[in-house]
C-alpha cells in the first residue's frame, strides 16, 4: 500500500470550521489497486465530490461518486464499460476511540487531525459493481434475466 499516494485523499478536519465544506477527489485504477481487490475490474476512473458538514459533535459526510470501470461479460466474455453514479453517506461521531458502529456510523478520535477517505471511495465503488455482469448488447434480450 502506497501511503504517500493515499495522502492526497486526506481531509484536514481539525482546521475546518463548523460549517459546510466541499471537496473533489479524482481517482483511478491506482486507488483501487491499493486495497488488493479480488474483484476483476480494470481501467477504473472517477470523481468523488464530498460534502462535509462539520459540527462540534460529528462530521456528516456525503460521497457523490461518478465513474466507470472496464468489466467482462459473464456470458459473452466481451469487455465493456460500466458507468457508475451514486451517493453514500457516513456520520463520523467524535469520541475517545475509533470504532465502527455500523456501515453508516463511525466513531473517530476527537484528536484526529486528518480524515483519509480513500478506503471509503474504494469500498463504495467496489460495492456498486454488479455481481451479474452482462454486456449492454445482451442485457435487454428477452431470454436474459436482469
Predicted regions and their residues:
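Acidic and generally charged, gly/proline-rich low-complexity regions
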Residues: 1-146
Amino acid at each position: 500500500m502506497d501511503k504517500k499516494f493515499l495522502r492526497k485523499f486526506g481531509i484536514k478536519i481539525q482546521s475546518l470550521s463548523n460549517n459546510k465544506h466541499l471537496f473533489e477527489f479524482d481517482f483511478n485504477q491506482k486507488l483501487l489497486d491499493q486495497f488488493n481487490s479480488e474483484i476483476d475490474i480494470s481501467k477504473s476512473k472517477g470523481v468523488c465530490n464530498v460534502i462535509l458538514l462539520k459540527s462540534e459533535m460529528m462530521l456528516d459526510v456525503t460521497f457523490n461518486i461518478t465513474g466507470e470501470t472496464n468489466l467482462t461479460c459473464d456470458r459473452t466474455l466481451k469487455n465493456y464499460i460500466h458507468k457508475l453514479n451514486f451517493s453514500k453517506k457516513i456520520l463520523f461521531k467524535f469520541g475517545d476511540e475509533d470504532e465502527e458502529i455500523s456501515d453508516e456510523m463511525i466513531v473517530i478520535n476527537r484528536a484526529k487531525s486528518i480524515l483519509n477517505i480513500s478506503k471509503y471511495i474504494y469500498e463504495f465503488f467496489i460495492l456498486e459493481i454488479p455481481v451479474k455482469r452482462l454486456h449492454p448488447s445482451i442485457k435487454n434480450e428477452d431470454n436474459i434475466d436482469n
